[in-house]
Amino acid sequence: MGQSFNAPYEAIGEELLSQLVDTFYERVASHPLLKPIFPSDLTETARKQKQFLTQYLGGPPLYTEEHGHPMLRARHLPFPITNERADAWLSCMKDAMDHVGLEGEIREFLFGRLELTARHMVNQTEAEDRSS
């Protein structure tokens, strides 16, 4: 892929990124597989996700400045994340991208990075999750 943008954050922009995260968490809040592993109030979760994605996409290091190194896998280990939940998470993100009109190379780039990250967070099989 011939990226036609410098920092992905610049291509998306703060406003669209904020809309994407808010729309994403609206979907997460009502998803039967995801709702049980997220807090009922997603305000702080969305705020941290905005900070993280800003930094992850080449913007200011907002997440690290407030929370330290992201250590994503370690921070997600307490939650039962299965391949099925990773798929659900990615589906919510695709829906959010559709809703806010994120398209083209930047969408492909971001979704590709998020897909790798979601797969890396998987820490249980579906069988282990059902037996918990």
Curated annotation (Swiss-Prot):
The record's listing under Gene3D superfamilies reads: Globins
Q: Which InterPro entries match?
A: GlbO/GLB3-like, Globin-like_sf, Globin/Proto, Globin_bac-like_CS, Hemoglobin_trunc
Summarize where heme binds, as residue positions: 45, 48, 63, 76
Q: Note the Pfam families from the entry.
A: Bac_globin
Keywords, in A-Z order? Heme, Iron, Metal-binding, Transport
Specify whether Transport is a keyword of the entry.
yes
Q: How cofactor binds (record note)?
A: Binds 1 heme group per subunit.
Does the record carry Plastid as a key word?
A: no
Tell me the domain of life. Answer: Bacteria
Q: Which cofactor does it need?
A: heme
Offer an example of a GO molecular function term for this protein: oxygen binding
PANTHER family for the chain: TWO-ON-TWO HEMOGLOBIN-3 (PTHR47366:SF1)
Q: What does this protein do?
A: Hemoglobin-like protein that exhibits a low peroxidase activity. Its very high oxygen affinity may rule out the possibility that it is involved in oxygen transport.
Return the protein name. Group 2 truncated hemoglobin YjbI
